[in-house]
Every structure is written in C-alpha cells, then in structure tokens.
Design a protein with these regions (language model features):
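Proline-aspartate-enriched helix->loop->beta-strand connector
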Residues: 90-93, 97-111, 248-264
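Alpha-helical, coiled-coil/dimerization segments enriched in small aliphatic residues
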Residues: 222-247
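N-terminal signal peptide c-region/cleavage motif recognized by signal peptidases
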Residues: 14-18
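Extracytoplasmic substrate-binding proteins
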Residues: 32, 119, 124-211, 236
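A short, structured surface patch at a secondary-structure boundary
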Residues: 50-103, 108, 132-133, 235
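Sec-dependent signal peptide recognition
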Residues: 2-11
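A ligand-binding cleft/hinge motif common to bilobed small-molecule-binding domains
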Residues: 115-125, 262-274
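Short helix-initiation/N-cap motifs at beta->coil->alpha
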Residues: 28, 87-99, 114, 136-138, ...
Length: 274
C-alpha cells in the first residue's frame, strides 16, 4: 500500500508534465515554431487569419488583434465577431508595440508572411512564439513576399489555403472545425467549377477591382483567382503583377464590363463615378 503511493504520485507528475508539453508546428514561412500544448491566449496581427479564426469558432482564445481590422475587414464585420469592439490592438500588419503585446501575456502571435523580419524577431526575443500565415503554397524564395511570382496561381492558393486553415486549426486545437471548413470549401468550389466547365474564355465577364487611390490587384493575387473561379476575367492581370496603383487611362483601356468595390471601401464608389 505505502509503496504504491510514490508510484501513483510519480505517475500523476508525469501525466501533468505531458499534458503541458511543448509541441512544434511549421508555419507558412517554413519556420519551425515551438508552442505550448494548449493555446488560450492568442494575438492576431493579420486579418485573413482573424477571419479564419472567426470561422473556426476560436475567438474565445483571442486576446488581441491588429489595429486595422476594421479597415481590412469592414466595420460590419462586428456582426460576425462582436468581441472585436473591445479587444486590445497591440500592433498591425507590419508593426508591433512590444510593451502592449507583453501586457496581454500571449502564448502565440499570428502575423502575415510579409511582416518585417525584425518585427518577428522582436516578438520572439520577448519569448513569444510567432506563426506566419500566407495562405499560399509556393517556392521558398516567394514565401515572404506580398506580391509573389507564382508559376501556378490556382495550385498555390488552393493548396495554400488548405495548408493555412489546417495550420491555424492545429495551433488553436480546432482541427475538427478546420477539416470541416476545408471540406466545405472544396465542395462549393467543385459545384461552381462544374457549372462553369463549358464556359468559353471569350464569354467570361471582364471585371476590375477598384480600391482607394486607383490601386488594384493584378496577377499573383488571390482576388483575380476568385474572379476566375466565379466565371470572370480580371482585366488588370495581363498587365500588372500583384497589388499596384494604376491610372484612369489603364482602366479605360482595359474596358471592364463590371467594376467591383469592396464593402470596406465605400468612398471608392463616389470616386469611380467622378
């Protein structure tokens, strides 16, 4: 009886240690990141990751977000994530206030793949793991770029989105939700692709995405790929790479049949009318 007690205590200690053991993940900059076994305090400095965390029902684990979330996702996004109204904002896509960040005691910080290396290093020097998200699967020399050169855009973004969702789900222990989201994305895309299978190239709707200051998305950006999946043709893709400013003469030359404006940029509608 008495010999059994030390063994029981040892077993409990070992079990407790195992339950709190660190784990490793590979982020989308191909960096090995060591994380606590269970994340309950995450800071999110990238809007795409924030959007996915909402869909994975992981917002109860989020204690801080990027300062430009309203600009990036639109003010009406609060309908999907009401807690955003009160969450601290210790940084943004390319900068961080390290004192404010430390005050939140995060166990992990999500950043964009194009976050400055020094920003990532500053957070890591403070002892906080950093996970970079690109939602792309690409060559190593393109991994940290905002405007990548992609040999196969469809493959890079289709597989990269799945990789990113799985990675975020793994970090936040939301694997079942991540797999369900991936399954739904695949099914919905397959449905649309089947309906557009016989659409001739010359019947695709010519479209343009208008952003503030005459900026738009060209080749290598996910926006153009979404347009193509929907049966449209991004008129800017043949002339520009990535996110760039263009001229009104460019837009007139491209002659789009439809101009899209994102809900987060309502002022652009009035600019386009002028």
């Amino acid at each position: 009886m008495f010999n059994f007690l030390p063994r029981l205590l040892l077993a409990l200690v070992l079990f407790s240690t195992a339950a709190q053991a660190d784990r490793q993940v590979t982020d989308q900059l191909n960096r090995q990141v060591t994380l606590p076994d269970r994340i309950t305090r995450a800071v999110v400095l990238q809007h795409q990751t924030l959007n996915l965390l909402v869909q994975l029902d992981a917002m109860p684990q989020v204690v801080g977000v990027l300062s430009s979330w309203k600009k990036q996702l639109g003010p009406n996004y609060l309908r999907l994530a009401p807690t955003l109204a009160t969450l601290p904002m210790p940084g943004d896509l390319t900068s961080v206030n390290i004192e404010s960040l430390l005050g939140l005691h995060p166990q992990v910080v999500f950043v964009a793949n194009y976050a400055p290396p020094e920003m990532i290093a500053q957070i890591e020097r403070a002892g906080i793991p950093v996970v970079a998200i690109s939602l792309r699967r690409e060559a190593a020399d393109q991994a940290g770029k905002m405007n990548p050169q992609l040999s196969d855009e469809d493959r890079a973004y289709t597989l990269g989105l799945q990789d990113g969702i799985r990675l975020i789900g793994e970090v936040m222990s939301r694997q079942p939700q991540a797999e369900a989201l991936i399954k739904d994305v695949i099914q919905q895309r397959a449905l649309v692709a089947e309906r557009l299978r016989d659409l001739p190239e010359n019947q695709r709707v010519r479209v343009y995405m208008a952003n503030p200051d005459l900026t738009t998305y060209g080749a290598g950006k996910y926006t153009g790929l979404m347009m193509r999946h929907a049966g449209a043709l991004n008129v800017a893709a043949k002339d520009i790479q990535g996110f760039k400013q263009v001229s009104i003469e460019d837009v007139l030359k491209w002659d789009p049949a439809v101009i899209f404006v994102q809900e987060r940029y309502p002022d652009v509608v009035q600019q386009d009318r002028k």
